[in-house]
């Protein structure tokens, strides 16, 4: 059975997401994937340079010292920190931690995740620089 009634389709512009701050931030957060791709490509380039010997590795180090690459890597770091912050804020919503019959608030979980991140970062830097 077919109908002749025309369904109402509400018009929607391509910039609908720009009207609400929540959606704008969501798009920025999802956009952090682009700098992550950049970092992945640079890392793979470094692995290939390491594989091909000292001369290739020296070229890779020279590439990393280029001011444009340094700026892109700083943008990538900022994007990674933003993405990490949003995931750490999401974690307490996904896990209900109950201590002595009461649900724990999100602050201790978020702070704990940042502490673990800082400790792991310091350990990795210590091993990389002084071991």
UniProtKB/Swiss-Prot annotation:
Swiss-Prot/TrEMBL keywords: Cell inner membrane, Cell membrane, Membrane, Transmembrane, Transmembrane helix
Principal location: membrane
Location within or outside the cell: Cell inner membrane
Transmembrane segments: 30-50, 61-81, 110-130
Membrane-topology annotation of the record: Multi-pass membrane protein
UniProt cross-references to InterPro entries, sorted A to Z: Fumarate_red_C, SQR/QFR_C/D
SUPFAM superfamilies for this protein: Fumarate reductase respiratory complex transmembrane subunits (SSF81343)
Any one GO molecular function term: succinate dehydrogenase activity
Entry GO CC: fumarate reductase complex; plasma membrane
Signal peptide coordinates: none
NCBIfam families: PRK04987.1 (NF003445)
Described purpose of this protein according to its UniProt entry: Two distinct, membrane-bound, FAD-containing enzymes are responsible for the catalysis of fumarate and succinate interconversion; fumarate reductase is used in anaerobic growth, and succinate dehydrogenase is used in aerobic growth. Anchors the catalytic components of the fumarate reductase complex to the cell inner membrane, binds quinones.
Subunit structure of this chain's protein: Part of an enzyme complex containing four subunits: a flavoprotein (FrdA), an iron-sulfur protein (FrdB), and two hydrophobic anchor proteins (FrdC and FrdD).
Family named by the database record: Belongs to the FrdC family.
Protein name: Fumarate reductase subunit C
Encoding gene, per UniProt annotation: frdC
């Amino acid at each position: 059975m077919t109908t002749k009634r025309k369904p109402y389709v509400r018009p929607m512009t391509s910039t609908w997401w720009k009207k609400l701050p929540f959606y704008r931030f969501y798009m920025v957060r999802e956009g952090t994937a682009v700098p992550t791709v950049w970092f992945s490509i640079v890392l793979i380039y470094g692995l290939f340079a390491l594989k091909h010997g000292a001369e290739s590795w020296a070229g890779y180090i020279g590439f990393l010292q280029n001011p444009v690459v340094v700026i892109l890597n700083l943008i990538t770091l900022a994007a990674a920190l933003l993405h990490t912050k949003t995931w750490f804020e999401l974690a307490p919503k996904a896990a209900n931690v109950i201590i002595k019959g009461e649900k724990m608030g999100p602050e201790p979980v978020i702070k704990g995740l940042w502490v673990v991140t800082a400790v792991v970062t310091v350990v990795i830097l210590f091993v990389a620089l002084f071991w």
